[in-house]
Amino acid sequence: MEDSQSDMSIELPLSQETFSCLWKLLPPDDILPTTATGSPNSMEDLFLPQDVAELLEGPEEALQVSAPAAQEPGTEAPAPVAPASATPWPLSSSVPSQKTYQGNYGFHLGFLQSGTAKSVMCTYSISLNKLFCQLAKTCPVQLWVTSTPPPGTRVRAMAIYKKSQHMTEVVRRCPHHERCSDGDGLAPPQHLIRVEGNPYAEYLDDRQTFRHSVVVPYEPPEVGSDYTTIHYKYMCNSSCMGGMNRRPILTIITLEDSSGNLLGRDSFEVRVCACPGRDRRTEEENFRKKEEHCPELPPGSAKRALPTSTSSSPQQKKKPLDGEYFTLKIRGRERFEMFRELNEALELKDARAAEESGDSRAHSSYPKTKKGQSTSRHKKPMIKKVGPDSD
């Protein structure tokens, strides 16, 4: 009996009668409406009710609203270094001018006096107007003004190539130094010039020329000082392949107001090398030799002075020295007698040479006659033999 009841409990849910009973128990609102053909009326009937859909979409909307609120300026995580922003200050031309302009404020640059020792890391040559420095070493540059500029004045530093065939190119670091992790998080890796010790430095790229520059606010000199000092660093060697590639560069320092108007300009040449003292000494010696070989002449006489100097040098070499006398100090009597005899022999030789030259000039009109006489003297006479049969 118990086995039959257990079999019925298993078979009832699987029978068709049980399913029809359960189907009739469902409320009519939960059954999908059908058309006369028995197919669903539309796809919209398959969607969830509106209250259920709003309940499910609620958490997503809350997340979308709360996500922007979490990104506040104070709690924002530090992002990686982004490319430098384009400067809103327009430049006057595609190639910046390098001519010195002091303006109304007497703006000009100055440098510390340093020697040419091998251990020096930064040295400036006045005669060459050139700064020699090592890679990534501090180079103090002095800003001098005769009167205080207006508030909001800025100081811009920009590097350009010195030679005309390279001026249109942008000065940038080589690919090797760009990949080096030597940045402070503020300067872009492709910028050559950096400012040290100034948190207000801005590294900018021009929209039109794509040139790199660094701008810092102008600070008046401190009490007891006559100038303001800015510490620059050059982050690539002058000999790096793919960068400057041994091409000389100029650093242009400009004084600008808050609107970008020029107030003053000054420039100097830069060489980034391993031994600044040695390179400065070598270039100054070459420059000095060049000046001695080609001295400066007043304007208007340069065209005539060049042939005169070249033609006068051979004349000085061909100038006879027979009429000049020299005094020679000799130690010892024996040496003196030897040199005296040598001098007398040379004097006698010169006298005989002069006499012979005089005789040759006097008898130059009779060379053939003398020659004929000399040959006839030594000529053997011919004798005709007379035989017995001759008359």
UniProtKB/Swiss-Prot annotation:
Residues 271-278 are annotated as: Interaction with DNA. Its main location: cytoplasm. The modification Phosphoserine is found at S9, S15, S20, S39, S181, S267, S313, S390. Zn(2+) binds at C174, H177, C236, C240. Residues 111-234 are annotated as: Required for interaction with FBXO42. The modification Symmetric dimethylarginine is found at R333, R335. This is Cellular tumor antigen p53.
